A protein has these predicted regions:
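N-terminal secretory signal peptides that target proteins for export/translocation
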Residues: 1-14
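Aliphatic-rich helix starts adjacent to a transmembrane/signal segment
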Residues: 3, 17-70, 74-76
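Short linear sequence motifs
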Residues: 12, 32, 212-214
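Short, well-ordered helical secondary-structure segments
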Residues: 12-13, 29, 45, 49-51, ...
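Residue-level preference for short coil/turn positions at secondary-structure junctions
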Residues: 14-17, 320-322
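N-terminal pilin/flagellin-like segments and related low-complexity appendage regions
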Residues: 62-320, 325-327, 333-335
Length: 336
């Protein structure tokens, strides 16, 4: 009986054995490996969750920037469309130039070309478009206009109003942007940008050179390297406005007609930047290898001959432009 009781106690003790140190270490190691694997899976997901809103913002910045530029590029060169003065701006002056224009940048035309800057001009849907009626005695003289068919009934000023942005241009390739500061019965008192004289145009415009006047929109776009912002400028005294941010690179490339432009033409026997006194075009035919458009390099758009008058001069090859390629690189706002 005693021996049997002793055997039962040994069996009970054997069933209460614990883990050895080695077994415990193995178990802890397995637990750490599994926990580490879980964190390795969770942490990238957390980073992705943090980055996803920035990616969305990045796409939005890109879309806003390109949509804004595209809207104005599509309109570039749209000209007058009323009666006998109908015609695109490219028949008179270059509506796209690779530099900033306006009151705040009076001398940038001297640089001729900037790959990250562009100024676009076009006539919007407006009744304010007509001929210059009388020759201007001086570049600072007031402008008298015709109330031609298409002008608002009973409006001798053909819809021009104080504060309106306007362009005056003619067949010589000259033009000036300005702001109407005062209106009278049959004359516009004009103000336009420096630097020569705030009250003077670059020339005295005359009906004999087919001078005309119209409401205009000008849009200048460029990248501010200090803030990495795409900037928009209206051409007046107001400072540029940001369109979108985190723009780390902006490039404009130009493609044009290999054939030389055929307008504007000077008066018979006259000359301009395109034609000599015999009416012969001075610009060459560009090598194209059969393509309808050729790339217009920075050198081609800055080597002359130059059209227009100071301070609104531009390279004659800008008349060739038919397509503009925009390259924009955007970054996220994340810093880690």
């Amino acid at each position: 009986m005693t021996r049997h009781a002793h055997s039962t106690d040994r069996t009970a003790l054997a069933g209460e054995r614990g883990f050895t140190i080695i077994e415990l270490l193995v178990a802890v190691t397995i637990m750490l490996v599994i926990t580490g694997a879980i964190f390795a899976i969770v942490d990238p997901s957390r980073s992705t969750a943090r980055a996803q809103p920035e990616v969305t913002d990045q796409n939005t910045r890109m879309r806003v920037g390109l949509d804004t530029l595209s809207k104005d590029l599509v309109m570039a060169g749209a000209g007058t469309y009323s009666g006998a003065i109908a015609g695109g701006l490219a028949n008179f002056f270059a509506p796209i130039v690779p530099f900033r224009m306006g009151t705040l940048y009076p001398a940038e035309y001297l640089d001729r070309f900037h790959p990250d800057r562009i100024t676009i001009a076009y006539v919007p849907n407006t009744a304010a478009q007509t001929r210059v009626r009388d020759a201007m005695p001086q570049p600072s003289s007031e402008i008298k206009v015709d109330a031609q068919p298409g002008c608002p009934a009973g409006d001798a000023l053909c819809g021009f109003r104080e504060g309106m942005r306007v362009v005056i241009f003619d067949d010589s390739g000259a033009y000036d942007f300005f702001t109407v500061t005062e209106v009278q019965t049959d004359a516009l008192h004009l103000q336009h940008r420096p630097p020569i004289n705030p009250d003077d145009f670059s020339k005295a415009y005359t009906p004999s050179e087919n001078a005309r006047i119209a409401q205009v929109e000008t849009h200048t776009y460029f990248r501010d390297p200090a803030t990495n912002q795409l900037m928009h400028y209206w051409g007046d005294n107001n400072p540029p406005e940001p369109v979108t941010d985190q723009i780390v690179d902006l490039r404009f490339e130009y493609f044009g007609d290999p054939e030389p432009p055929t307008a504007p033409r000077p008066l018979p026997g006259g000359t301009n930047c395109l034609f000599d006194g015999a009416g012969v075009n001075q610009l060459p035919i560009l090598p194209s290898n059969g393509s309808s458009l050729v790339e217009l390099t920075p050198a081609m758009l800055s080597d002359g001959p130059f059209c227009g008058n100071v301070p609104n001069q531009y390279d004659a090859d800008l008349y060739r432009i038919r397509r503009v390629r925009v390259t924009m690189r955007v970054q996220t706002g994340l810093r880690d």
